[in-house]
């Protein structure tokens, strides 16, 4: 009887250690995979950054100058001001939109809404709504 109890205890210990070693080996394998993916992502991010620098220098890209900013915003301000002073221009523009233009602008709107929604889901880390603690705990 003593012998069966002792062997049962040793068998349980052996099974527990086997389960622990299996879990440890799986965790090590997962860690190696994550490290490999991370190293790959860092490498390609560096390559992309260096390529971007070379393109920036070769193409002669530069941020817009102050005069360019001023001209763009001045034109935008004048357009908004003219539409505010003459509302009939807005109606004429709306009437001149064709079916293909309406479809194109609708597609753009859906894309923008989709990207906004994706950003919201990423920010919340939840697809539907925010996680709110229940009122039962109060």
UniProtKB/Swiss-Prot annotation:
GO terms, biological process: cristae formation; protein-containing complex assembly; proton motive force-driven ATP synthesis
The keyword Mitochondrion is assigned to this record: yes
Alphabetical keyword list: ATP synthesis, CF(0), Hydrogen ion transport, Ion transport, Membrane, Mitochondrion, Mitochondrion inner membrane, Transport
GO cellular component: mitochondrial inner membrane; proton-transporting ATP synthase complex
Record's keyword annotation contains Membrane: yes
Pfam assignment, any one: ATP-synt_G
GO MF assignments: proton-transporting ATP synthase activity, rotational mechanism
Subcellular location(s) per record: Mitochondrion inner membrane
Location, primary (coarse class): mitochondrion
Function in brief: Mitochondrial membrane ATP synthase (F(1)F(0) ATP synthase or Complex V) produces ATP from ADP in the presence of a proton gradient across the membrane which is generated by electron transport complexes of the respiratory chain. F-type ATP synthases consist of two structural domains, F(1) - containing the extramembraneous catalytic core, and F(0) - containing the membrane proton channel, linked together by a central stalk and a peripheral stalk.
Subunit (UniProt): F-type ATP synthases have 2 components, the catalytic core F(1) and the membrane-embedded component F(0), linked together by a central stalk and a peripheral stalk. The central stalk, also called rotor shaft, is often seen as part of F(1). The peripheral stalk is seen as part of F(0). F(0) contains the membrane channel next to the rotor. F-type ATP synthases form dimers but each monomer functions independently in ATP generation.
Protein family (similarity comment): Belongs to the ATPase g subunit family.
Protein name from the UniProt record: ATP synthase subunit g, mitochondrial
Name of the gene: ATP20
